[in-house]
Amino acid sequence: MAKKSMINKANAPQKFTVRGHNRCKLCGRPHGYMRKFGICRICFRELAYRGEIPGVKKASW
């Protein structure tokens, strides 16, 4: 079990706000994050395939 001081330190607000990481809002994945949509590439692909993201469709050229 952690010391009470270590628990308080972990729960304290961060000293530097820049250290925050972007994570997917659906699954919490830290990599492959698409800032415009706020989700990772895998969740984006699934939602786009089901047509749940308005304005997104499969590209063809």
UniProtKB/Swiss-Prot annotation:
One of its GO terms (cellular component) is small ribosomal subunit. GO terms for biological process: translation. This is Small ribosomal subunit protein uS14. It comes from the Bacteria. PROSITE patterns: RIBOSOMAL_S14. NCBIfam families: PRK08061.1 (NF005974). Part of the 30S ribosomal subunit. Contacts proteins S3 and S10. Binds 16S rRNA, required for the assembly of 30S particles and may also be responsible for determining the conformation of the 16S rRNA at the A site. Belongs to the universal ribosomal protein uS14 family. Zinc-binding uS14 subfamily. Its cofactor is Zn(2+).
